[in-house]
Structure formats: structure tokens, C-alpha cells
């Protein structure tokens, strides 16, 4: 079934951003554009290149009125450890959402039940909290921030 125009369910998750832990809720996404960028796990090989690519384009997303949220099933503590130990991930200033309960992954239909990890899913959510663009890639198929930004501009 299509996810287009599906409203994001209420949520409250922990996040790591700019050296701090914080709570992010559905209220935080309403009134502006959002990108939810799901990836399998911290400390993996493809994920750092994708997340760094997003960071390199972050100012353009922000100028377009859009917040980026990366999401994995790792805890916010693991996000901090990865951020502190990886040169690429250490550059990231957008919120890194923790979904250890799998609530967000289930809502966006990207949970790989057998592994307890997320698929590589990219979702653009409008200011009303509805999904208007989505893409889910298999395995090690990486994503491109320029293409995601183009889709945001077209939305």
C-alpha cells in the first residue's frame, strides 16, 4: 500500500544533536518540511557516506525550510558514541533520532523484523505531517542528498 499522504503518527523519541540529548516529538515536525532518513545501524559502512552527504547539503535543506532527521534503531547513547568516534559522523549537526522501540520504523513501514533494524528509507513530510515523497532502497544501495533535495524542491 502507498505511503503517500499517510499522516505521521504521534511519536516521542530521544535524539542526539550538537553534543546534547533531546526529545523530538511529532509537534516538532508540524509547520515545516521534514526529511526522515532511516538507515540500518550506526558503525556500518554505507551509512556514514550517506549521512555525511546529507550534512554537506544541510544548509540548503534548512534554507528551504526543511529539517533533516536521521533515524536508526540504535539508542541516542550509541549515536553519541558514533558521533564522537567517526570523523564523518562527527560533522553532523542535524538531529539523530533513536528508535530502539521500533515505533518510528513501524510507522514508516521500514522495520526489518528479523534483524530489528531499519531499511534504507527516505521520506519527505509536508508541514501538515503527511508523507509526500518516499523511497526505500534494498541492502547496500546508497542514496544521494542532491536527488533528495531536488525532490523536496518539487514537493
List PLM regions with ranges.
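Chalcogenol-based redox active-site neighborhoods
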Residues: 1-155
Amino acid at each position: 500500500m502507498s505511503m503517500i499522504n499517510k499522516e505521521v503518527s504521534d511519536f516521542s523519541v530521544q535524539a542526539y544533536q550538537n553534543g546534547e540529548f533531546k526529545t523530538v516529538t511529532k509537534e516538532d515536525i508540524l509547520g515545516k518540511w521534514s526529511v526522515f532518513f532511516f538507515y540500518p545501524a550506526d558503525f556500518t559502512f554505507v551509512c556514514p557516506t550517506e549521512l555525511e552527504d546529507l550534512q554537506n547539503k544541510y544548509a540548503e535543506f534548512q534554507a528551504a525550510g526543511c529539517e533533516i532527521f536521521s533515524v536508526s534503531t540504535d539508542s541516542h547513547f550509541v549515536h553519541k558514541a558514533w558521533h564522537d568516534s567517526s570523523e564523518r559522523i562527527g560533522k553532523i549537526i542535524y538531529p539523530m533520532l533513536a528508535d530502539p522501540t521500533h515505533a518510528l520504523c513501524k510507522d514508516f513501514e521500514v522495520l526489518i523484523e528479523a534483524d530489528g533494524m531499519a531499511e534504507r528509507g527516505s521520506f519527505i513530510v509536508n508541514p501538515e505531517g503527511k508523507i509526500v515523497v518516499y523511497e526505500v532502497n534494498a541492502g547496500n544501495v546508497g542514496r544521494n542528498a542532491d536527488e533528495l533535495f531536488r525532490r523536496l524542491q518539487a514537493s
